[in-house]
Amino acid sequence: MPNKYWKYENLKSVHLELSTLCNSICPWCPRYDNFSPNLNPNIVEGAYSLERFKKHFPVEFLQQIRMWTFAGDYGDPCTAPDIILIIDYINDYTTHSPTIQINTNGGMKNEKFWYNLGMSLNENSYVIFSVDGLEDTNHIYRRNVKWHKVMNAMKTFSSTGAKGIWEYLKFRHNEHQIDNAKEMADSFGFEIRFKNPNGFEGEPMPARDKDYNIEYEIYPAKGVQIAPIATSSREFANRIDTLNYDEYKDKVESFYKDRSTCITCSANHSFGGGYEIRINHDGTVWPCSFFGHLSKKYLKGRTVSKVQQWQAQDIFKDINNNLEELTLKEILDSDPFHGVYSKWEGNKIMLCSDVCGENKMMEKIYA
């Protein structure tokens, strides 16, 4: 095992959460509390400005980055007022042509914005439109997203000749529309990808109102089984808030010891043999998107991911990983993720084993 992963000089890819603002109210989204439209209390709403971006990512740093991913767990990057200015800054001051991937639900802004966004992208870059159905079904999961705005966005963007990808989460309520979606994607000149969603926590996914009443339930596509959650797992997760992690650390690290898997870290990919990092809107730096996702997730009364979050909070409790206080080089030179990679053997880090083990329990959402 190398002495240190995530060396500053080896970075080739950055996954940045540009914004914690969003027009959509997707039930499982960690931006919201317990499948409701109520904002997660851990979230501070805001968006990266161009000036803040320049401060965190100076011109000399741009030169080593081959890929930028603008996708958020807590917001849609296209809600950021300065997103096009940031893209222009990257393209204008990078001596090569980096790939910029943007994930969006497409339900915000106007035609001028989508035209300008398409025109701002270089030949290696693209937008992934997360649209889960057609006019009568997309809003079932993408709550509050207006279909006419999505269509205006996709049509206008496609008219620029920029590369677009339609990403379609398959549910029981929209799987009958797959062929129609393929035809529509062809009309835009978009590739279309179909994926199975996360978010089924031992039962159908509830869509709750602001008072936490269930308005309706969402089911996976036919043939996809909802994995049950053992009663013992629920009981342990419910006790976590009253327990001292130090007393249970060995137990947590042994939960997956019998898995016949090895961890192949997705953040250690092939962009010149370098590594990817995730940076949340608040400036915190994480080893990957999954740790960034977990860092602000509000799990009161929940079971799934609660033990993983408990473990992660202990791993990172003594590190300073915030770009508002240190430079990215200072953060990574301190080897902040040693507590992650040093325990990959034996599947001791639950989140890593779940998402990057041989038997992945989660499908990677980001391309």
Where do the PLM segments sit?
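Terminal, non-catalytic domain-edge segments
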Residues: 2, 362-367
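Recognition helices and adjacent regulatory flanks at domain boundaries
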Residues: 1-11, 24
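Conserved beta-strand->loop/alpha-helix structural units within folded catalytic cores of enzymes
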Residues: 12-28, 72, 166-170
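Radical SAM enzyme [4Fe-4S]-AdoMet core and its adjacent flexible, acidic
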Residues: 9, 17, 32-48, 62-63, ...
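Conserved SAM/AdoMet-binding glycine-rich loop
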Residues: 21-24, 31-35, 50-133
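Signature of lipid phosphatidyltransferase scaffolds
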Residues: 325-334
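Immediate flanking context of iron-sulfur cluster ligation sites
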Residues: 335-351
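Local cysteine-cluster metal-coordination motifs and their immediate loop/turn environment
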Residues: 21-31, 350-361
